[in-house]
Amino acid sequence: CRYYFREDGIMAAGPTEIDGQIHYFTPKGIEVVLVNGLNPVPDWYAPNLVTLTGDHQVDQLCYDALVKMLDDCAAAGIEYEFNSGYRTLYTQTAILEYRTREHMESYSLNFRDARDKALETVAVPGTSEHHLGLAVDLLGKEAIPWFTEHCWDYGFILRYTQEKEDITGIIDEPWHFRYVGTKVSLDMKDSGLCLEEYLGAEPVTSGKVHALFGEKLYEETIYGKEEQK
């Protein structure tokens, strides 16, 4: 856990500027990296990736807790599918471009309208929690309810719910879990707050996201022409 004390000696809580960049701290002063449509992955952040299985990677920070959670789920006789962990900028861009083309063909939309529709369900590259290596997508008819109930005990939170769509800017994703550590997850469990609320961050709206990124949202090649790493 990282704590930060301001010049007046008071421990930081909520959004706090440090060396010209905004950092987010819980009400108890623990720093949590916030990534959403208004907060791209910070320049200073670099995931320490380890391989979980196959070509799936996660940050080492959550590896042990994730393995324990998955093992306990399996021990309970519940089958799950590990769908996604860390994503490169390249991969996120490919997903966005695929969805855009799909909407153009399925709904006979022009590129801009199709991109807007794609952005309703796909995060702008650079603003996905999957870039952190701390978010995982876990599937399974019986597994999702199990993870939803027990994730908190392993340091994970259910990140996106229907009730909080107007705050997170993301539709209901019952499969998406974010690692924040047990000190934070257990404190959040019964709070009814999403991460933005808990950290005192402003709500994410499509209007604010468009204002932040502008025409970059409609440039077909702006994000994803780097080589995949």
In which residue ranges do the predicted regions lie?
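Charged, often glycine-rich, active-site loop that binds/positions anionic groups
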Residues: Q92-M104
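Extracellular adhesion/carbohydrate-binding repeat motifs centered on closely spaced tryptophans
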Residues: C1-E31, D64, E149
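Conserved oxyanion/phosphate-binding beta-strand-loop segments in alpha/beta enzyme cores
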Residues: I30-W44
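Active-site acidic/histidine clusters and adjacent loop/turn architecture
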Residues: N48-R87
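Mid-length scaffold segments of soluble, non-membrane domains
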Residues: Y80-E81, G85-Q92, T127-H131
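Catalytic cores and adjacent binding grooves of peptidoglycan-active enzymes
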Residues: K28, K68, L109-K229
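Extracellular modular ligand-binding repeats in secreted and cell-surface proteins
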Residues: F5, F25, Q60-Y63, L217, ...
